[in-house]
A protein has these predicted regions:
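Positively charged n-region of N-terminal signal peptides that target proteins for export
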Residues: 1-6
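Bacterial N-terminal signal peptides
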Residues: 8-20
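Scaffold/interface architecture of coatomer-like assemblies
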Residues: 25-313
Length: 313
């Protein structure tokens, strides 16, 4: 086992980040429109091809032309499964479902399994298309309450240090209770966390779609804490074009149906290209984005903000 940061050994940090985040971590023109690409997914009862003629793209509140729409090939995608090391030991009954999910992914899909603790992510290996090997790295969490420090610290650290320079679409699935212990009270009156917002912005800059399945940790939490954590997970998912698959009082009996939904979301993902303007003098800024469709029976999940120039080759 080794810390994610270990993947950076032997590389110049700036060089690796430029490869991992094609444009988000690089300087781009600070004025005028630049080609920008983002990943979106389609939710429908039955798989239906997305009609580009019925898509509406708005950048900073202004309608912008969609220049291309290409279906993501799952075999080129990267899927990171981040497990909170503070989850209850009863999570062990879910391990078989998680292993089956990993081995069922399309040939070529690169998978990473990491454990969130102490504000970072620890994994046995980097991204790999050897699904059987990755599945073997899934283990029972340490079940130490609060060991992740904050799942949002872990998410921020991971997406900023994405351990691959591949240009494929990037997906994260978080398994955590979602509680941010550093934001004070979990009451309904205290649901604005700077750490959650920072994590979602980091994911948006890195072009990462973040989904989640809420699962209780080993600490004695419930009531407002459960609501708070699940609300934060939904917030991050909505902001990055992902989905929050389970919100409930008790832990899910099985992860299988939610993992199936996550697999379907990856299979029904597209790369959308359009022009977006970067703000003068702010090379690392985010621009408001809204993508919708008038196609009946379909719902589009897309990030709420994008880094102008991100994803462009």
């Amino acid at each position: 086992m080794h810390k994610l940061g270990g993947f950076l050994a032997g590389f110049a940090v700036a060089g690796l980040m430029a490869g991992a985040l094609p444009v988000a971590a690089q300087e781009i023109p600070n004025e005028g429109p630049v080609e920008t690409r983002t990943v979106l997914s389609v939710e429908a009862k039955q798989p239906v091809p997305l009609d580009p003629k019925q898509i509406k793209v708005e950048v900073n509140g202004r309608q912008t032309a969609l220049t291309s729409l290409t279906r993501i090939q799952p075999a080129t995608a990267q899927v990171a499964i981040l497990i909170d090391d503070g989850l209850r030991s009863s999570f062990g009954i879910q391990i078989d479902d998680l292993k089956k999910f990993i081995t069922s992914l399309p040939v070529g899909t690169q998978v990473f399994v990491g454990y969130m603790r102490n504000g970072g992510v620890t994994g046995a290996q980097g991204f790999s298309a050897d699904h059987a090997s990755v599945a073997k790295s899934v283990r029972i969490p340490l079940s130490a309450p609060g060991i992740s420090a904050s799942p949002y610290f872990c998410l921020s650290d991971f997406v900023k240090r994405w351990p691959s320079n591949s240009g494929g679409a990037r997906f994260v699935l978080m398994l955590t209770n979602g509680v941010d212990p550093y934001n004070g009270s979990t009451s309904l009156m205290n649901q604005t966390s700077p750490y959650v917002e920072a994590a979602q912005r980091d994911a948006q800059r890195a072009g990462v779609s973040v989904s989640a399945i809420a699962y209780a940790d080993a600490g004695v939490r419930g009531g407002s804490a459960s609501f708070s954590g699940q609300s934060y997970l939904q917030q991050v998912a909505d902001a990055t074009g992902g989905r929050s698959y389970y919100n409930g009082t008790f832990n899910p009996v099985s992860l299988s149906p939610y993992l199936d939904e996550f697999r379907s979301a990856i299979a029904e993902s597209y790369a959308a290209t359009f022009m977006a303007s970067a703000l003068r003098g702010k090379g690392n800024t985010l621009t408001r984005l809204k993508i919708s469709t008038s196609q009946k029976g379909l719902k589009v999940h897309a990030p709420e903000a994008v880094h102008p120039g991100s994803g462009a080759e």
